[in-house]
Amino acid sequence: IKERVEKTIKLVDLEEHSESNVQDLSGGQQQRVALARSLVMEPEMLILDEPFSALDAFTRAALQKDVRSIAKDLGINLVIVTHSIDEAVLMADRAVIMAGSPGQIEEEIVVSLPEERNAQDPEVQKIRGHLMETFRRVSTVEN
């Protein structure tokens, strides 16, 4: 178990904080601790609910990239719940737009982009636009 914990701490880049109390860490580091708690169990899938919402832009971008990389390296599938269309495009291989109560799938969109994604890339912007339009349409129907 100790070996697995040490490996996971290294994986989430918290080696220098391994003896720290969680409450003494920054928000981004606390998110890394939460990720490590899940990863140490060696899951096949992680479900993350708004995992980056409380982070500043720089920390969010770094953690998004790290989470994608870790998931790919370990062969873990991610299900990420987000209200951020930009985050969906940058993180997802598929984006699902849900609406209604109880939630129903309105549209599923394949996000066929390379691993390294740049928000300014025209293909990223095209998929973002499609998601925005779908979201507007669904929101209009609900109201």
Task: Give the residues covered by each predicted segment.
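Conserved signature/switch motifs of ABC ATPase nucleotide-binding domains
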Residues: S20-Q23, M41
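Hydrophobic anchor residue at the start of the ABC signature
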Residues: L35
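Conserved ABC ATPase "signature" region
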Residues: K2-H17, S69
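Helical segment within the ABC ATPase nucleotide-binding domain
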Residues: R60-L74
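Conserved beta-strand-loop-alpha-helix hinge in the C-terminal portion
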Residues: G100-H130
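Conserved H-loop
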Residues: G75-V81
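ABC transporter NBD signature
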Residues: S26
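Catalytic Walker B motif of ABC-type/P-loop ATPase nucleotide-binding domains
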Residues: L46-D49
